A protein has these predicted regions:
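N-terminal secretory signal peptides
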Residues: 1-11, 16-24, 30-36
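Short, glycine-/small- and polar/acidic-enriched structural segments
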Residues: 34-189, 195-196, 205, 212-218, ...
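Short, hydrophobic secondary-structure boundary micro-motifs
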Residues: 88, 135, 285-287, 337-339
Length: 354
């Protein structure tokens, strides 16, 4: 594995439904875990031995764009040291990406990067613009939080007429909690004020009463929740969304069309890494320290335990998840009114395992 920062430093609900997908199921190890999300694969002891089913016949160099500082993506960052990429015959060069989502997706569409990981709720609006990028899998759930003062609002309904602090008006957390507000009868466009702050000032804004809730992602929101006088109003692991993936794998359209086995190999390696991380969070936490800044292994371990790294989605199940997000993003005026959620989800998906 090599590391590249040339692009700057700013970030299977199951194989089912078709005969081809059914044939592929045998190459994934399924667990009889009663706590696994319905239809999702969960890690099994044999899962780590499954790489040969998707390993390439010869070594292939590949550029993977990701945010190496995002704790929820720690399994991706340590996939190399644990041999997941190597077992798939992949020689991965990490590109620590911090540009805008549009620049990231353009890098995939133009071949500057082969694959990337990121948050669905940040990517979908950009993908609506027509980038030649395909999503291949959802990797896990969790990592978005809405925080309030202990004596502040306790339900979404109580946020009507209030102000919510965010770091970015196009952030995945703003999009997600807009969906939740809408589900609870609060119009996120007209009934709520959104105000931007640097992430390290959200707590101060709460304490001063400038905002009544703060929205963001881990690790900062995990830390904010644990401060005295703060409480978690919600996360993205609630209601219908509890069983959905928040982060996804994307690949360039050209890679899917010309080298589908490569797209399958990198996707499978990443899914393996997340499943393995669910069983070995302590090891992942230690390994991730070489990438992370301003954290420690105990915090990384604790945050990983609150995410759902044992659950992922591919194929039709993944399309179903994206369609749910697309439907609800359309309802809160993020996606165009003319967008058909199901057709949109199908158009940006590639079933690399069929």
């Amino acid at each position: 594995m090599t590391f590249n920062s040339s692009l700057s430093r700013r970030r299977l609900l199951g194989l089912a439904g078709t005969a081809a997908a059914a044939a592929a199921v045998g190459r994934f190890a399924w667990a009889a875990d009663p706590h696994a999300h319905a239809g999702h694969a969960a890690p099994a002891q044999s899962f780590a031995l499954d790489a040969k089913g998707w390993a390439l016949p010869a070594p292939r160099k590949l550029k993977l764009a990701t945010n190496l500082n995002a704790i929820c993506l720690a399994p991706v960052a340590v996939a190399d040291s644990q041999g997941f990429f190597r077992n798939h015959n992949l020689e991965v060069e990490f590109v620590n990406f911090g540009h805008s989502t549009e620049v990231l997706l353009e890098s995939l569409a133009t071949g500057k990067a082969d694959a990337a990981t990121g948050m669905a709720l940040r990517w979908l609006k950009a993908l609506e613009q027509g980038f030649d990028v395909k999503l291949t899998a959802g990797t896990h759930g969790g990592c978005l939080r809405l925080i309030a003062q202990e004596n502040g609002p306790r339900r979404f309904e109580e946020l009507k007429g209030k102000t919510i602090g965010v770091t970015d008006m196009a952030s995945p957390d703003k999009n997600f909690f807009s969906l939740m507000l809408k589900r609870h009868g609060v119009d996120p466009v007209r009934d709520v004020n959104w105000r931007t702050y640097p992430i390290d000032l959200l707590g101060t804004a709460l304490e001063k009463g400038e905002i009544q809730a703060a929205s963001g992602s881990d690790p900062m929101m995990y830390r904010l929740r644990n401060q005295p006088g703060k409480r978690e109003l919600s996360t993205n692991l609630v209601e219908e969304y509890a069983n959905l993936s928040c982060c996804v794998v994307g690949v360039g359209g050209n890679l899917v069309r010309k080298e589908k086995p490569v797209a399958a190999a990198v996707t499978h390696a990443i899914l393996q890494a997340h499943a393995w991380a669910a069983q070995h969070p302590e090891t992942v936490a230690q390994d991730f320290l070489k990438f992370a800044v301003n954290t420690n292994s105990e915090e990384i371990h604790a945050i990983l335990n609150e995410h759902t790294h044992a659950h992922y989605s591919v194929g039709k199940a993944f399309v179903d998840e994206i369609a749910v997000y697309a439907r609800d993003l359309k309802a809160v005026e993020v996606l165009r009114a003319s967008t058909d959620p199901r057709k949109f989800a199908e158009s940006i998906h590639a079933d690399v395992f069929s």
